[in-house]
């Protein structure tokens, strides 16, 4: 009898412990479910090369702990690859222009750099790139300074030359140091095509989550073949942050050199606006790469782009930059209202001028986005 009671007591104790564990699991699930309800989902969209991923990296630096040493080191081969790929693009572009351009002579690489150019082009075409040594960096620097390469770089918009080119070429000695660890700026400039979906959770007010919203930001591949992966992310989105690189009005797509990048951005923007699942979703439009735009607009007329063919310059210098920017902004505003159903026009729509590489601008912009979304939430709750 005593043995039976002892067994029953053990079973009861085990049941009690199991019930306690079950209750704890259920409590945690309930807490996590409640926490999830308070997390706002942001979708970062845009065509390839729009600067989305740079914005994403800035968020990690600004509102999280940034990149630890292991993460920084992981970018070293990426940055070295960027250098090799870029110098190959410029070398091969110069050769093509020397063969086909009317003013071909200025694209002919000097005799002392021809052999170096062929060697670097071969390296740039490999699947595995060597570590950037001082010797290779010096050869790249010599080729970069060649007059033909500089003339080719001036026509980089025709050759898919990336925005990071000048920055990395001017830092070759540091990048080739045996103990090189990328800086946060190096990481921001590093060019990696986003494939699939990456996410980050953050609060623009810092660690004190009680005083601000918590966001989960999703960055997705911008190239055409990546866009089918967006679909499952569309439900339950608080806001779409759409990045448009306004400096790329004279460039063509990486994946389709017959398609103007700005026209592709326009079509993608309009397609996103029409999606039924975004009926009540706020839209934040980032007119990005303003730093490049303000330099380019003084050299390349805005009306080279079909969408902007009715643009008329009115001045020079800073006035012209502002005039051109306001014209582009107005075009996007018109597109928004033309492609938004009448019953959706009251959803939040804001436009921000951004430079993804400028941390102060990105920080200020996201605080404005946070303020806008918090006001919307208060309004919907009847508290405003």
From Swiss-Prot:
Belongs to the G-alpha family. It comes from Lotus japonicus. Residues 215-224 are annotated as: G3 motif. A lipid is attached at residue 2 (N-myristoyl glycine). It comes from the Eukaryota. The gene is GPA1. Residues 38-384 form the G-alpha domain. Residues 284-291 are annotated as: G4 motif. A lipid is attached at residue 5 (S-palmitoyl cysteine). GO terms for biological process: adenylate cyclase-modulating G protein-coupled receptor signaling pathway. InterPro entries: Gprotein_alpha_su, GproteinA_insert, P-loop_NTPase, Plant_Gprotein_alpha. This is Guanine nucleotide-binding protein alpha-1 subunit. The helical domain (69-189) is required for self-activation. SMART domains: G_alpha. Its cofactor is Mg(2+). One of its GO terms (cellular component) is heterotrimeric G-protein complex. Mg(2+) binds at residues 53, 194.
């Amino acid at each position: 009898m005593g043995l039976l009671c002892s067994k029953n007591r053990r079973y009861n104790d085990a049941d009690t412990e199991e019930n306690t564990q079950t209750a704890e699991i259920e409590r945690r699930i309930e807490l996590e479910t409640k926490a999830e309800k308070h997390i706002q989902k942001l979708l970062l969209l845009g065509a390839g090369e729009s600067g989305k991923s740079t914005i994403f990296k800035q968020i990690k630096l600004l509102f999280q702990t940034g990149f630890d040493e292991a993460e920084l080191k992981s970018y070293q081969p990426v940055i070295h690859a960027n250098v090799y790929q870029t110098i190959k693009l410029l070398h091969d572009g110069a050769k093509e222009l020397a063969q086909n351009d009317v003013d071909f002579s200025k694209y002919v690489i000097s005799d002392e750099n021809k052999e170096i150019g062929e060697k670097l082009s071969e390296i740039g075409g490999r699947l595995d790139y060597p570590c950037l040594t001082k010797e290779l960096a010096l050869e790249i620097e010599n080729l970069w300074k060649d007059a033909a390469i500089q003339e080719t770089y001036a026509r980089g918009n025709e050759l898919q030359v990336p925005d990071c080119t000048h920055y990395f070429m001017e830092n070759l000695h540091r990048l080739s140091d045996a103990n090189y660890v990328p800086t946060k700026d190096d990481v921001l400039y590093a060019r990696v095509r986003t494939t699939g979906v990456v996410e980050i959770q953050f609060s623009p007010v810092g660690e004190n989550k009680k005083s601000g919203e918590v966001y989960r930001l999703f960055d997705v591949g911008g190239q055409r073949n990546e866009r089918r992966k967006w679909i499952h992310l569309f439900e339950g989105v608080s806001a779409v942050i759409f990045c448009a690189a306004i400096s790329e009005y004279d460039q063509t797509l990486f994946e389709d050199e017959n398609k103007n990048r700005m026209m592709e951005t326009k079509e993608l923007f309009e397609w996103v606006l029409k999606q039924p699942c975004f009926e009540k979703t706020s839209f934040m439009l980032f007119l990005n790469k303003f730093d490049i735009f303000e330099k380019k607009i003084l050299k390349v007329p805005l009306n080279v782009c079909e969408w902007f063919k009715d643009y008329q310059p009115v001045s020079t210098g800073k006035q012209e930059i502002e005039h051109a920017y306001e014209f582009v902004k107005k075009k996007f505003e018109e597109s928004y209202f033309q492609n938004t159903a009448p019953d959706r026009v009251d959803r939040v729509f804001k436009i921000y001028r951004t430079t993804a590489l400028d941390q102060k601008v990105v920080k200020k912009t996201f605080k404005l986005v946070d303020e806008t979304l918090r006001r919307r939430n208060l309004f919907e709750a009847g508290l405003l």
